[in-house]
Amino acid sequence: MSDYKSTLNLPETGFPMRGDLAKREPGMLARWTDDDLYGIIRAAKKGKKTFILHDGPPYANGSIHIGHSVNKILKDIIVKSKGLSGYDSPYVPGWDCHGLPIELKVEQEYGKPGEKFTAAEFRAKCREYAATQVDGQRKDFIRLGVLGDWSHPYLTMDFKTEANIIRALGKIIGNGHLHKGAKPVHWCVDCRSALAEAEVEYYDKTSPSIDVAFQAVDQDALKAKFAVSNVNGPISLVIWTTTPWTLPANRAISIAPDFDYALVQIDGQAVILAKDLVESVMQRIGVTDYTILGTVKGAELELLRFTHPFMGFDVPAILGDHVTLDAGTGAVHTAPGHGPDDYVIGQKYGLETANPVGPDGTYLPGTYPTLDGVNVFKANDIVVALLQEKGALLHVEKMQHSYPCCWRHKTPIIFRATPQWFVSMDQKGLRAQSLKEIKGVQWIPDWGQARIESMVANRPDWCISRQRTWGVPMSLFVHKDTEELHPRTLELMEEVAKRVEVNGIQAWWDLDAKEILGDEADQYVKVPDTLDVWFDSGSTHSSVVDVRPEFAGHAADMYLEGSDQHRGWFMSSLMISTAMKGKAPYRQVLTHGFTVDGQGRKMSKSIGNTVSPQDVMNKLGADILRLWVASTDYTGEMAVSDEILKRAADSYRRIRNTARFLLANLNGFDPAKDMVKPEEMVVLDRWAVGCAKAAQEDILKAYEAYDFHEVVQRLMRFCSVEMGSFYLDIIKDRQYTAKADSVARRSCQTALYHIAEALVRWMAPILSFTADEVWGYLPGEREKYVFTGEWYEGLFGLADSEAMNDAFWDELLKVRGEVNKVIEQARADKKVGGSLEAAVTLYAEPELAAKLTALGDELRFVLLTSGATVADYNDAPADAQQSEVLKGLKVALSKAEGEKCPRCWHYTRDVGKVAEHAEICGRCVSNVAGDGEKRKFA
């Protein structure tokens, strides 16, 4: 028997079946680096319209976690897809390098500044530490396949950037947005510094909850207000608080103007409370026998005075909108130095912003004899005992409540009035302008807009000063006596910025004021404060984007970070840009959710449910991680676990197998010589290219809308359904058995070539390593890298006016599905082995019958059977299977007649009819020794 294997066009490619990504990717990365792939892309895109995604700088501390990976991969997908869409999209990664966490790390190793090291040496250690952290994170980000200018990232500690941060502050001062004030700020007594809102976390804490009576100074005036004369004992206004330690700073009692307040007679005294809370307060203080003597509106009590229980002065009743009936007594203890609401209302009434607490959290000398030098959290019991002794304590109990804590130390923080510098939200209309700017930005998802609007509408002035060592100095000089800024502040700041540009922030601390102030130096002092690190990162639109040459003066198109950044980087950037330039720093803001485990739980080392990106890359490869990120809807929480990553690996295999099939069947195809013109191609091949065209339209639309999970779903549908379960199955016969250089085979290869050219580009932003690998195996002249090109433009489809248009093939797909069901049943019943052992008769109503008949003998190739006949629907025998999908179709199956051809495996009656090729069928004889078969349709 002759061996006809050598006459077949068997698929062949060096493209491996197994991805082996964990092993193969590092070598590809090395090639990208050696070739300077990022530089090649920049050169290729030079002069195109720009799309700038500005990197929000991660903090230079610790290893990257899965959340970092999600963030960088999403950015990379966008940058690469924009490149393929014809944009020049430079990506400059950055790092946030100043601030408390780095100081704490350096402190742990070397001690506090001023102990073993000078502050200057301490700063040098911080700079060194940040640089090593940047290097570690950079390696991991590169390993993810993220392309960017990794050799020249921006660091907020670059001398030039530090100088530009100072310049940004100068511009804000010049525009009139800075003011100084004693104001309550979140204060950590362990850090001994003010904290930004983003540095505050909430934990449960147990505190004493107390009801305290403030006796009225003028009892008769109160009786008159309530129109009563018979009151037994003194009258008091009762406040409720869970922070007894703040009582020394009390300067008023806030009540609501529109609430009804009741004068309640209890044993030996009368108390004033909100009428709606009388019952709950009486229950709490254990009084069952009480009488309401009268009621008045809160507004009636404004400015009546009450004696502080132990401080020896009296305080006014004032009206505030922050008073609620949720808990307490309807009268709020007000200490302007210890709370933002208290501060705001204190300003309105001209109250003192008293601050009896030092930076270490202990009372300052002269506060009160038994409290001086005591830590405020230890003082609660002393204050309670004091109130008891003075007869002012009506009730005390322990209460668990949510309390603000330092994100670093996890210890409770306090509100403490300190002299700080603020960017004012209202003195020059910053709030109003920011709210206006928000409306001109596209927020993705769109709920981001309402979220940041409410934050901007309600946020207090931004405290931008910090009492730290490792940070950008505010670079201000204030008058010794008046504490006013130097009249030449902007000039002086530019002078400092020039020095910082050369020598870094240490230049400020080394600066002798005489050098730039001359004789005035004796009258001015250098402000020792540093800037909040959120000012560093929030000003990068100016300190980085405006000055990097690759951005050519264009503003950022997009900021993309986790959803916690509405209150963080998106907010600080908006504030600074609007204060500097009167406009938002971005056109689009995209936020992604946090990563959770497979059960939806937050990632936590203590639960042990964290997923390390390094582990995933070492086991499965970066492309699997990238595919997981792309296939997850980032607008909500992003679940990741071993099981979920395994599913991503399964999807990856399907895509890889499709790519491998295309490459293997392009064996021997040279597009320059072998390409078949569309009008000469087999109709099914044109249909397949049309499928790719339709898929490309959907995929490009999804990339444009940043719907990457839609990209993956459409890609999977194309690979699995349109190609895998239909087209690629059908063409195997023609690919393998037709004459190597026949139109029948070259038409098919032409289709596969067009499909592969499109597919490799669809994959490139997401499966970057695999796309690069596929690119290397594609036939034909091409650039070295897929990333330098654009979406494939060589796709075409069938015209609707053609008889065998898309609708025709859609119906054929359904027919084939119905035939497959019948074949599967026959296989289960052991009537046939494979589908080529079967012949089918399709009993069809006239319209469908005409379509099926149009394919002639090629119908069997579409159905993958050895025989296919079309007959009248009404002639169907009783055992023909009625289609559930197509009402006008019944299918009958019989065993195919004739012998099996060993070359094409079809059963046919003409095997052995040609003497020289006695073992094979007539079709194969023609393909081996004759002119070759002709195919028109399939």
UniProtKB/Swiss-Prot annotation:
Entry GO CC: cytosol
GO biological process terms, semicolon-separated: isoleucyl-tRNA aminoacylation
InterPro entries listed in its UniProt record: aa-tRNA-synth_I_CS, aa-tRNA-synth_Ia, Anticodon_Ile_BEm, Ile-tRNA-ligase, Ile-tRNA-ligase_type1, Ile-tRNA_ligase, M/V/L/I-tRNA-synth_anticd-bd, Rossmann-like_a/b/a_fold
Modified residues (N6-acetyllysine): 183
SUPFAM superfamilies, A to Z: Anticodon-binding domain of a subclass of class I aminoacyl-tRNA synthetases, Nucleotidylyl transferase, ValRS/IleRS/LeuRS editing domain
Binding-site positions, L-isoleucyl-5'-AMP: 561
Required cofactor(s): Zn(2+)
Keywords (A to Z) from UniProt: Acetylation, Aminoacyl-tRNA synthetase, ATP-binding, Cytoplasm, Ligase, Metal-binding, Nucleotide-binding, Protein biosynthesis, Zinc
Binding-site positions, ATP: 605
Gene Ontology MF: a single term: tRNA binding
Protein name in the entry: Isoleucine--tRNA ligase
Gene it is expressed from: ileS
